[in-house]
Amino acid sequence: MKNTMLIPLVTVTWFLFGWWIYWAFPTGPGLAPSIMNESAALITDESAFSAKWYVATSDLMAVNLGDHISGVFWAAFLLFSWTAASIVSGAVIERITVFAFGILAIAIGSVFWTIDAAWGWHFDGWMLKLLGYHDAYASGVIHAVAGGFALGILAVLGPRIGKFSSSGEPRNIGPRNPWLVTIGLFLIYTGFWGFYAACNIPIFDLGPEYGMEGVTYFTATNIYVTPTTLSGITFNFLMSLSGGLLAGYVISKGDPFWTYSSGLAGVICASAGNDLYHPIQSMIIGMIGVVVAYKLH
């Protein structure tokens, strides 16, 4: 994969294949009770868990006033599969064929990240039950898993051609078009912000808990169905973004590629607990994560 236009093409279209594998297992692959208790493949009747929602004629695909959230999760989890593959694509650039990448993209997008998501997000997941794992906005469930998957591939592929000099000193390979990189990263900022908001659904009634009997007082919830607020996660998103940008600018001595990339890195570093942190904590975590990433590169 060397052509500039080939990367976005395969990134967008790979899930035309992975899609069918992902939705063919409505109850998961059945590797452990923490995923689901049973495994069911290619079942489209009501005998399988939520399988009836996966067909094109279901109410989920149209306006259904009795269901406010299923469509959001349906699209969000597809987006997660897509994101996992896109992270891998950036890591293996110039060293892999499209066919090989397609196989790996289907593997990470259809199988591996879903297992990790079951462990860390499902109420029966062992990471959640035994370790108290908390990852409200996919910091580890998506980005860490995809990064680890990419690292395993790179251990086989090796570095990019020209990355190291004959003496073993690493060379900096900058972006081909800094302007497009800048635009793309700012679009990702906006999309990530929207993802944060979409992950917080106003379905949790705190009226009785606050002693307001007969009064409905809705607040937002995350994937763990714990209360949070759109205001709080917005502040934390912006502060982790700001911390990443600031740290990237300072440590890279004003390099625009690293500055803007560090903004995204700051958000990802703090996303696991951005529904819990104080905004200053989010900023500090974002800064520390960027410093570590820059030193490791």
Which residues does each predicted region cover?
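Hydrophobic alpha-helical transmembrane bundles of multi-pass membrane proteins
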Residues: 1-297
